[in-house]
Amino acid sequence: MITLITEQLQKQTLDELKCTRFSISLPLPDHADISNCGNPFQLVSEGASWRGLPHCSCAEFQDSLNLSYHPSGLSLHLRPPSPGSSPQEQSLSQVLSPEPPDPEKLPVPPAPPSKRHCRSLSVPVDLSRWQPVWRPAPSKLWTPIKHRGSGGGGGPQVPHQSPPKRVSSLRFLQAPSASSQCAPAHRPYSPPFFSLALAQDSSHPSAASPQSGSWESDAESLSPCPPQRRFSLSPSLGPQASRFLPSARSSPASSPELPWRPRGLRNLPRSRSQPCDLDARKAGVKRRHEEDPRRLRPSLDFDKMNQKPYSGGLCLQETAREGSSISPPWFMACSPPPLSASCSPIGGSSQVLSESEEEEEGAVRWGRQALSKRTLCQQDFGDLDLNLIEEN
């Protein structure tokens, strides 16, 4: 079986495998004239185009549609309705063949966006004209609510007041958010947070009932849902931005405090600009400040600085040269105190000689200790004059 297939494939040539394109026109079976449409299965050569074929106008239905099948796909041809046709046919033809719009009626493209919208990637081009009203943090600049009651309801209690009073009653925007517009008017729902924060005066105020906690709004304020939009934080400088400035009646007692404010900052002075408290202490800026009289530097006493500390060798030589009989305390500890001639008995010359010998031994012993340790002063005591010590 395989050999037969391979032999047949070898006999075929590339010319026999040339592809042909078919164009099929399907007329209605009850149509009499088939010459206009051609044969039901018409073979067209590859070089011929389907656009050159005669147009088949026989596939006409009662709803004024014309169908003709071509290799490029199913094309739908419409003919204008006759004046005697039924209104259903006219309405169908108007739906299927809309009139081309006039160039004068086309909407004017919006102006190029400002730099603020060029920087913000969250604002698309078609919504560049829609500027949200920018409001700062809602805890600082709310105007005081006069009728503030403690209710048992779960929903927010908002006073229902007229628009010209301009107190903080929550109302919808003129172009409210998509989630608030899409909700039906008969079903109550809780208001989204950004619709409360971006509330604006409108002709149809809406209020929240404290018992049920629902959010009611008029059906007239609900319009078809606009495309969703992400809110950008860039403030818009429009004519509506001035109405949300802080009022003169605002006080620290009227506006609620932030719950996350530290306890130490509650006694700071209240100001609109909230200046930084650390501006007066600029650590990075070096300036010439006047010296603080409370922190005076201690004056230098040069007399005390010129006084040399007691050095044993020098003082010993100086006292020896001056002929004074005062010996240093550490030398007194090394050797017994010498007895002068006035203290010794008159007839005891032998005792005086023996004491002088002890002085010599004590001085030599002290010189050896000073040479070995050199802890009291770094001076060489090898050149000490022992005769002066003996005379002393």
Swiss-Prot record:
This is Protein FAM53C. Disulfide bonds: none annotated. Residues 201-215 have a biased composition (Polar residues). Signal peptide: none annotated. Keywords: Acetylation, Phosphoprotein. The lineage of its organism: Eukaryota, Metazoa, Chordata, Craniata, Vertebrata. Belongs to the FAM53 family. It comes from the Eukaryota. It comes from Bos taurus. The keyword Acetylation applies.
